[in-house]
């Protein structure tokens, strides 16, 4: 249950980003989101809420149409198919009022013990890059961000794929990422493609990149201000993971 009533969260605490991961009938979610949006837009400044979600089309409890996660899509090596599935996801998410998509995962899965590999496009960075572009074009639109776009938050910069011993950095024991053979740039290939495709947001990760910085990417001025904003020229939204 929420810590505070929805009316208080919207009108008094001015919450304007809400993540809703589904689990019930989409028609109920649409009514709920519309009710919250009506509260927000009826406030003094009328600033609307941005509703976000993780991918739902590989989660049978979501009430959405079902197809394989990113790894299954990568097995087809068909960028056109990935683009079309993303376009369908756009339609389904907009139907319930969701405009922020917490994906795709641009992590290159070079550590086979990492448990989140099914959510990635695999270990081949050039293939990942090709499919990332298609995914973003399907969700956001090939012509850039517009009225019918669902914004993609590509993750987890600069890449969770090489986590040490496969320990995920969402947990206290998943502290480090390693780049044997100097492969840091290899893991950036899909992220560069995502930015070229116009990704509206980038999500950082919580692992410390060995040999790159002494703090996690989410706290790294070197990686966010220096690399992502500076060298790579990203001007969109940067968010942390949760």
Segments (PLM) and residue ranges:
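Glycoside hydrolase catalytic-domain context in secreted enzymes
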Residues: 1-242
């Amino acid at each position: 249950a929420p810590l505070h009533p929805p009316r208080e969260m919207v009108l008094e605490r001015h919450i304007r980003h809400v993540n809703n991961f589904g689990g019930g009938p989409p028609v109920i979610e649409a009514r709920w989101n519309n009710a919250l949006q009506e509260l927000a837009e009826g406030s003094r400044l009328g600033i609307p809420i941005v509703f976000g979600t993780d991918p739902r089309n590989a989660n049978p409890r979501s009430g959405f149409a079902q197809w394989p996660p990113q790894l299954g899509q990568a097995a087809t090596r068909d960028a056109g198919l990935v683009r079309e599935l993303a376009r369908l996801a756009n339609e389904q998410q907009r139907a319930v009022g969701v405009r922020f998509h917490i994906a795709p995962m641009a992590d290159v899965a070079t550590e086979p013990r990492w448990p989140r590999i099914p959510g990635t496009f695999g270990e081949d960075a050039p293939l990942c890059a090709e499919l990332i572009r298609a995914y973003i074009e399907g969700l956001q639109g090939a012509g850039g961000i517009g009225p019918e776009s669902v914004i993609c938050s590509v993750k987890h910069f600069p890449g969770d794929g090489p986590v040490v011993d496969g320990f995920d950095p969402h947990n206290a024991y998943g502290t480090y990422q390693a780049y044997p053979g100097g492969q840091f740039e290899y893991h950036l290939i899909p992220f560069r493609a995502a930015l070229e495709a116009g990704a509206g947001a980038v999500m950082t990760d919580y692992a410390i990149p060995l040999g790159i910085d002494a703090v996690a990417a989410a706290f790294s001025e070197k990686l966010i201000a220096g690399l992502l904003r500076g060298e790579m020229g990203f001007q969109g939204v940067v968010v942390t993971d949760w």
